[in-house]
Amino acid sequence: MSRRYLFTSESVTEGHPDKICDQISDTILDALLTQDPSSRVAAEVVVNTGLVLITGEITTKANVNFVNLARKKIAEIGYTNADNGFSANSTSVLLALDEQSPDIAQGVNTAQETRQQDSDELFDKIGAGDQGIMFGFASNETPELMPLPISLAHRIARRLAAVRKTGELSYLRPDGKTQVTVVYEDGRPVGIDTILISTQHTATIGEITDEAAVQAKIKQDLWSAVVEPVFGDIDVKPNDQTRFLVNPTGKFVVGGPQGDSGLTGRKIIVDTYGGYSRHGGGAFSGKDPTKVDRSAAYAARYVAKNIVAAGLAEKVEIQLSYAIGVARPTSILVDTFGTGKVDEETLLELINQHFELRPAGIIHTFNLRNLPSERGGRFYQDVAAYGHFGRADLDLPWEQTDKAELLKQAANESLSAAIAQALT
């Protein structure tokens, strides 16, 4: 008997209060790494009505104007009208910054493997910036090897922002959320159950002043200008049974930091796989690459995506764990959920042979310290909204599948060797 079930993921627009914070944090990171690639950064941001607080720990040789960086990013997002209770020019920006703890720095600067003279390898010189667990995931249900629900939620959120910025739907405002419920049958997406969009808007639209009429206009426009274009190249499409919900409270005029406070690192499921895979709990934004919350999560995605791209599993989840001040992972776990074409022990061997998972090695593989300067001063801020994974619109090193053929060949060789041994 086939199993039919629903799975839901959400996304938010760049104007959501939490995402404002993520983007300011990563704008600061970009600026610091551009001037000083060795900067140690843990930049946290809080926003509320008329207020931005930048706090955290930063050790750097760079000289940047944090206040100007925050205002510029807020304006880029679209908050330029003081009447909305939050705008680039009128908001107060407060700073409360310290340097990185020397107790932490000594373990990052010189890993335990080097301090105890257990290794003289280059990649053993830098220790993990903290303990923790990180997950990476990939699935073959979309071309970008991401789960369909989060992929659709991001697409709708990005399209929602696009029609606002181009003026196609000029009454929209920056804050917004999306949610998509996908119908699955035997583990494969077969339909769209529900599409939800909550979007900030003006109180009236032209001469339309009645609240119900305003919402009817928004719903009609969002279907034609946002939803239909998103599903144009998607095989699984909404039908006449699909529920389409828009601003279910009845209106969404008060939004952004005036409606809700925001905080860096509060949208970690939106940033990753939409709940389809497990999450270790660590946020990404505002953290330099020595923080394995970020860099190791990127590495785990890279491993998972290459395994699926190689055809060795239909979906796979990778767990990594680290100890603060230690270079080598304390554990690696592979789970193919029964979809593997080779056993998980073989996949673990392939990971150990072909992927570098020490922090210094991850930084080197992805060039994480130099990407901001090489890309005109902005890199991390562009992944701070609409997801860090599956981004076909961005050239992200951890999204490359350059090891897929190598893994496929190595897996075939391992299988041939196992067969030969069994026959002797």
From Swiss-Prot:
GO biological process: one-carbon metabolic process; S-adenosylmethionine biosynthetic process
E.C. no: 2.5.1.6
Enzymatic class: transferase
Residues involved in Mg(2+) binding: D18
GO molecular function: ATP binding; magnesium ion binding; methionine adenosyltransferase activity
Amino-acid positions noted as binding ATP in the UniProt annotation, renumbered to this chain: H16, D175, G176, K177, K251, F252, D260, R266, K267, A283, K287
Transferase recorded as keyword: yes
GO cellular component entries: cytoplasm
Reactions catalysed, as given in the entry: L-methionine + ATP + H2O = S-adenosyl-L-methionine + phosphate + diphosphate
Cofactor: record remark: Binds 2 divalent ions per subunit. Binds 1 potassium ion per subunit.
UniProt-listed SUPFAM superfamilies: S-adenosylmethionine synthetase
Chain sites annotated for binding K(+): E44
Binding-site residues for L-methionine, renumbered to this chain: E57, Q100, D260, K291
Major localisation: cytoplasm
Role of this protein: Catalyzes the formation of S-adenosylmethionine (AdoMet) from methionine and ATP. The overall synthetic reaction is composed of two sequential steps, AdoMet formation and the subsequent tripolyphosphate hydrolysis which occurs prior to release of AdoMet from the enzyme.
Family: Belongs to the AdoMet synthase family.
Quaternary organization: Homotetramer; dimer of dimers.
Name the record gives this protein: S-adenosylmethionine synthase
Organism annotation: Nostoc punctiforme (strain ATCC 29133 / PCC 73102)
Gene: metK
